[in-house]
A protein has these predicted regions:
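A short linear-motif detector with a strong N-terminal bias
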Residues: 50-52, 73-76
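Phosphate-binding/catalytic loops
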Residues: 70, 76-164
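Conserved active-site segments centered on acidic
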Residues: 1-68, 158-164
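A structural signal for well-ordered alpha-helical scaffolds and beta->alpha junctions
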Residues: 28-32, 75, 151
Length: 164
């Protein structure tokens, strides 16, 4: 998204784990093959900016807190672990990614039926929600959709607040 919008010079984007589960003897694992397949399906990895061939897992550090303006987390466990590793979030940098996502819109709304069988659409807020974890569901597409929604919302937030 950043590359598509011509904003690569304004961003430094990194990914880091909050645990060492994917790091063995000081070396991180590469991106999980089904996750790589999902990324490739959406054209990620085709450019120098999005190339993830050499990407390996690493754990977030205290230095990351001072280096980056925002630390965006997939779930509340990640927030707790990030705060434990980096110290107190005194600058308000640590957030849930989906807190920036728009509410679920037409076509992805929850559909329910009332007792008279009339369909009712309900808009659902994503604020405070976790990104779908494919480790448990195997659904990398839902995870992709959640991450995209959060990233789009975050870019819109930066556009409105920081005028990027």
């Amino acid at each position: 998204m950043v590359e598509q919008r011509g904003l690569t010079e304004q961003f430094e984007i990194a990914s880091a784990a909050t645990s060492t589960e994917e790091i063995w003897n000081g070396k991180g694992n590469p991106i999980y093959p089904p996750a790589q397949a999902e990324l490739k399906k959406h054209g990620i990895g085709k450019t120098a900016y999005t190339n993830f061939a050499g990407k390996r897992a690493r754990q977030v550090t205290k230095e990351d807190y001072h280096h980056y303006d925002y630390l965006l987390c997939a779930d509340t466990n990640n927030i707790r672990n990030t705060e434990r590793i980096t110290g107190a979030d005194t600058e308000g940098k640590i957030h849930l990614l989906l807190d920036y996502a728009d509410e679920l819109q037409e076509g992805s709304q929850l559909q329910t039926k009332n007792k008279s069988s009339n369909s009712i659409s309900q808009t659902i807020s994503r604020r405070g929600k976790s990104i779908a974890d494919p480790w448990y569901s195997g659904d990398f597409t839902q995870t992709w959709n959640d991450v995209v929604a959060g990233c789009k919302g975050f870019l819109n937030y930066l556009k409105n607040v920081h005028k990027i």
